[in-house]
């Protein structure tokens, strides 16, 4: 087997499988919460649908490599299984509107889209040409997914808060990207290495931002508006794939309740109390008058 003749490729491939395995399990707490509450709340399904599509693409690409990318198949096969479980759970607990939209995206992207790619590659390309076409598609999809963390980093810079960007996940995603980068270099595969250059860079930027803003005290005015800036999709999206993009976090998917109405409520309560309160001297005079009347 060609892979065993390259010690570094084998080492980085095994490390990449282990780290990616951990990253694939990152959404487990989210789905435990969904199962307990029997509701998907504000979470979205796009990250998991995208992750499944990415894993399917990389398996198909690795199958064209004559066994030299076997470790890509193992981790992405696990990814297909775990992402399918996530999607089934999500659809089971989603409301009707969300369920229908999820199934539409799943059908268009993972069934029709993937089937179209397979048909085009099988009918119109052969050998190294097919490998190049598939590699280009995989790189293009992975790079497009890398745009998701940019929205999260923008929120961090604007709000001066790292609430939506946990350091641990950013660290694991960065390590995973670096590992698969070296794996791609070891097997001399440009299509595996290239997306992870961007992944490693964005992961490093996320950790730097976290260190900068970790102890920054967020002004109240900014803190009340930051939930408006966070939108999902993040996606994450396909954050849990072999070619790991930047973190698109579940906390970003689930938007917290808006806080901008709280000060107004307090003001209203204060006004009500002030209207109901009477001056102590006036109250004493009224009591004296009542006693004199008696």
UniProtKB/Swiss-Prot annotation:
<feature type="transmembrane region" description="Helical; Name=7">
    <location>
        <begin position="193"/>
        <end position="213"/>
    </location>
</feature>
<feature type="transmembrane region" description="Helical; Name=6">
    <location>
        <begin position="167"/>
        <end position="187"/>
    </location>
</feature>
<feature type="topological domain" description="Cytoplasmic">
    <location>
        <begin position="214"/>
        <end position="294"/>
    </location>
</feature>
<dbReference type="GO" id="GO:0080112">
    <property type="term" value="P:seed growth"/>
</dbReference>
<keyword id="KW-1003">Cell membrane</keyword>
<dbReference type="GO" id="GO:1905201">
    <property type="term" value="F:gibberellin transmembrane transporter activity"/>
</dbReference>
<dbReference type="InterPro" id="IPR047664">
    <property type="entry name" value="SWEET"/>
</dbReference>
<feature type="topological domain" description="Cytoplasmic">
    <location>
        <begin position="154"/>
        <end position="166"/>
    </location>
</feature>
<feature type="topological domain" description="Extracellular">
    <location>
        <begin position="1"/>
        <end position="7"/>
    </location>
</feature>
<comment type="similarity">
    <text>Belongs to the SWEET sugar transporter family.</text>
</comment>
<feature type="transmembrane region" description="Helical; Name=4">
    <location>
        <begin position="105"/>
        <end position="125"/>
    </location>
</feature>
<feature type="compositionally biased region" description="Basic and acidic residues">
    <location>
        <begin position="279"/>
        <end position="294"/>
    </location>
</feature>
<dbReference type="GO" id="GO:0009555">
    <property type="term" value="P:pollen development"/>
</dbReference>
<feature type="topological domain" description="Cytoplasmic">
    <location>
        <begin position="29"/>
        <end position="42"/>
    </location>
</feature>
<feature type="transmembrane region" description="Helical; Name=3">
    <location>
        <begin position="70"/>
        <end position="90"/>
    </location>
</feature>
<feature type="region of interest" description="Disordered">
    <location>
        <begin position="273"/>
        <end position="294"/>
    </location>
</feature>
<dbReference type="GO" id="GO:1905200">
    <property type="term" value="P:gibberellic acid transmembrane transport"/>
</dbReference>
<protein>
    <recommendedName>
        <fullName>Bidirectional sugar transporter SWEET13</fullName>
    </recommendedName>
</protein>
<dbReference type="GO" id="GO:0052543">
    <property type="term" value="P:callose deposition in cell wall"/>
</dbReference>
<feature type="topological domain" description="Extracellular">
    <location>
        <begin position="126"/>
        <end position="132"/>
    </location>
</feature>
<keyword id="KW-0677">Repeat</keyword>
<dbReference type="GO" id="GO:0051119">
    <property type="term" value="F:sugar transmembrane transporter activity"/>
</dbReference>
<dbReference type="GO" id="GO:0005886">
    <property type="term" value="C:plasma membrane"/>
</dbReference>
<feature type="transmembrane region" description="Helical; Name=1">
    <location>
        <begin position="8"/>
        <end position="28"/>
    </location>
</feature>
<feature type="domain" description="MtN3/slv 1">
    <location>
        <begin position="10"/>
        <end position="97"/>
    </location>
</feature>
<dbReference type="GO" id="GO:0008515">
    <property type="term" value="F:sucrose transmembrane transporter activity"/>
</dbReference>
<dbReference type="GO" id="GO:0009901">
    <property type="term" value="P:anther dehiscence"/>
</dbReference>
<feature type="domain" description="MtN3/slv 2">
    <location>
        <begin position="133"/>
        <end position="216"/>
    </location>
</feature>
<keyword id="KW-0813">Transport</keyword>
<keyword id="KW-0472">Membrane</keyword>
<keyword id="KW-1133">Transmembrane helix</keyword>
<dbReference type="GO" id="GO:0015770">
    <property type="term" value="P:sucrose transport"/>
</dbReference>
<feature type="topological domain" description="Extracellular">
    <location>
        <begin position="64"/>
        <end position="69"/>
    </location>
</feature>
<keyword id="KW-0762">Sugar transport</keyword>
<feature type="topological domain" description="Extracellular">
    <location>
        <begin position="188"/>
        <end position="192"/>
    </location>
</feature>
<comment type="subunit">
    <text>Forms heterooligomers with SWEET1, SWEET3, SWEET6, SWEET7, SWEET8, SWEET9, SWEET11 and SWEET17.</text>
</comment>
<feature type="transmembrane region" description="Helical; Name=2">
    <location>
        <begin position="43"/>
        <end position="63"/>
    </location>
</feature>
<feature type="transmembrane region" description="Helical; Name=5">
    <location>
        <begin position="133"/>
        <end position="153"/>
    </location>
</feature>
<keyword id="KW-0812">Transmembrane</keyword>
<dbReference type="InterPro" id="IPR004316">
    <property type="entry name" value="SWEET_rpt"/>
</dbReference>
<dbReference type="Pfam" id="PF03083">
    <property type="entry name" value="MtN3_slv"/>
</dbReference>
<feature type="topological domain" description="Cytoplasmic">
    <location>
        <begin position="91"/>
        <end position="104"/>
    </location>
</feature>
């Amino acid at each position: 087997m060609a892979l065993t003749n390259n010690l570094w490729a084998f080492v980085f491939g095994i490390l990449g499988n282990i780290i990616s395995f951990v990253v694939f399990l990152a959404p487990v707490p989210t789905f435990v919460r969904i199962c307990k509450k029997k509701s998907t709340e504000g979470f979205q399904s796009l990250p998991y649908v995208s992750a499944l599509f990415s894993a399917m693409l990389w398996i198909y690409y690795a199958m064209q490599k004559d066994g030299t990318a076997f470790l890509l198949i193992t981790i992405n096969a696990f990814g297909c299984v775990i992402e399918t479980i996530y999607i089934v759970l999500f659809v089971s607990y989603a409301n009707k509107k969300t369920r229908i939209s999820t199934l539409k995206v799943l059908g268009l992207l993972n069934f029709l889209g993937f089937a179209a790619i397979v048909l085009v590659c099988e009918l119109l390309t052969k050998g190294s040409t097919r490998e190049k076409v598939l590699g280009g598609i995989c790189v293009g999809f992975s790079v497009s997914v890398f745009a998701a963390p940019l929205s999260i980093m923008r929120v961090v810079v604007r709000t001066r808060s790292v609430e939506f960007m946990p350091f641990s996940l950013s660290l694991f995603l960065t390590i995973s990207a670096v590992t698969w980068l070296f794996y791609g270099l070891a097997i001399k595969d440009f299509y595996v290495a290239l997306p992870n250059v961007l992944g490693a860079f964005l992961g490093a930027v996320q950790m730097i931002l976290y260190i900068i803003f970790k102890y920054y005290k967020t002004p109240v005015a900014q803190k009340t508006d930051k939930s408006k800036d966070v939108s999902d999709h993040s996606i994450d999206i396909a954050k849990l794939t072999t070619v790991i993009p930047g973190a698109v976090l579940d906390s970003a998917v689930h938007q917290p309740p808006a806080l901008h109405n709280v000060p107004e409520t307090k003001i209203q309560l204060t006004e009500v109390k002030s209207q109901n309160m009477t001056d102590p001297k006036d109250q004493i005079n009224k009591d004296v008058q009542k006693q004199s009347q008696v």
